[in-house]
Amino acid sequence: MVESIARVRHIRVTPQKARRVVDMIRGKQAEEALAILKFAPQGASEPIYKLVASAMANARVKADASNSFLAEQDLYIAKAFVDEGTTLKRFQPRAQGRAFRINKRTSHITVVLATPDEADVATTAKKASK
């Protein structure tokens, strides 16, 4: 089983909005996920698209380094999650000398691609036959 990881940190997308996009692609084939992200209207879909493409390239390089064959159509998104990054705190001037705080949130996004094991394929086939 080939596994590759790609991370992006301090991306200027709120974690809540990024999680909506990541939930759409979790568990899907990598190429199907790229197609979903390409046409998704959410703003967070562009950095996540680049991240999935980077994870695919990482898998390709890892397979080349170990002299093993990698079928890119077998890659699927094994794990994908969004963690909260640092928050930039800004102030908005308001009436009568007040100031309201604006939180500009950032995200840490992680995508793990994997190829299914023979054991995974067998258990999936068993579940499908029941």
UniProtKB/Swiss-Prot annotation:
It holds the Pfam family Ribosomal_L22. Keywords: Ribonucleoprotein, Ribosomal protein, RNA-binding, rRNA-binding. It comes from the Bacteria. Disulfide bonds: none annotated. One of its GO terms (cellular component) is cytosolic large ribosomal subunit. SUPFAM superfamilies: Ribosomal protein L22. GO terms for biological process: translation. InterPro entries: Ribosomal_uL22, Ribosomal_uL22_bac/chlpt-type, Ribosomal_uL22_bac/org-type, Ribosomal_uL22_CS, Ribosomal_uL22_sf. Part of the 50S ribosomal subunit. Belongs to the universal ribosomal protein uL22 family. This is Large ribosomal subunit protein uL22. The gene is rplV.
